[in-house]
Regions:
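Short internal beta-strands
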Residues: 47-51, 131-132
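Short phosphate-binding loop-to-helix
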Residues: 48, 54-98, 106, 110-114
Length: 223
């Protein structure tokens, strides 16, 4: 059995940016970039693309990596994330899953390797490892402030250390993922990514800005 299997999920029915995982980003599509980075990462034993897209399957074959054809329901908007994650776990045979997305295209090879190093050092004390990003913003829920007192409004840099899951890199066992129907365990280790590497593409504007950042960084760093 493999020790760490990287799973990339690609569905053809993305809503806000049509077919974004296979959309040309600079000079390749997002899936191709992600595969090329992961193939260089030490300690990843296998890469599997879990998808309903025939084009993504063909790309997987071109790169000589594994793929799993996803059933239509699990690629639909009707399928909640909880069922989707359980299905991914049940269809991945490995001691650990490294779950990652094409839509975080700015993560470097070295960051994946550092994440795995942290996982190896702390795996006996935590059951999931999840990347996060700091949020230094004035937040409200139901018209009530969440992280500040409006009568004593601080400078933004002095706001509490709130973090958000960015779902860019996650490691856990398939059994825990299936049981919890989640990427988050009972005792997670949160690994902080800077805002740039944790940047996630959800909208057309996100796509265009990520492409700008990628082009800017390409001559300065290995991606």
């Amino acid at each position: 059995m493999n020790y760490i299997t990287a799973v990339i999920t690609v569905r053809s029915g993305s809503q806000r940016v049509k077919n974004k995982n296979l959309k040309i980003f600079c000079d390749k599509n997002l899936l191709e970039y992600k595969i090329e980075v992961l193939k260089k990462v030490k300690k990843i034993d296998e890469i599997i693309v879990n998808t309903d897209s025939d084009e993504a399957i063909q790309i997987s074959k071109n790169y000589n990596i594994g793929y799993k054809k996803r059933e239509p329901y699990f690629a639909s908007s009707e399928c909640p994330n909880s069922e989707f994650w359980k299905n991914i776990a049940e269809n991945t045979k490995s001691k650990f899953i490294l779950f990652t997305h094409c839509t975080n295209p700015l993560i470097k090879k070295s960051t994946y390797e550092k994440f795995i190093e942290v996982f190896e050092k702390n795996k006996n004390n935590h059951d999931s490892f999840n990347s996060v990003t700091d949020v230094k913003e004035f937040l409200f829920l139901n018209k009530k402030p969440l992280n500040f007192d409006p009568s004593k409004s601080p400078n933004s840099q002095d706001l509490p250390n709130v973090i958000k899951l960015n779902f860019a890199i996650n490691i856990l066992t398939p059994s825990l993922m299936a049981k919890k129907k989640s990427l988050i365990g009972d005792n997670p280790f949160f690994y902080n990514l800077d805002a740039e590497e944790g940047y996630d593409i959800n909208t057309k504007l996100d796509f265009e800005f990520a492409e700008y950042l990628f082009k800017k960084n390409r001559s300065q760093t290995e991606l």
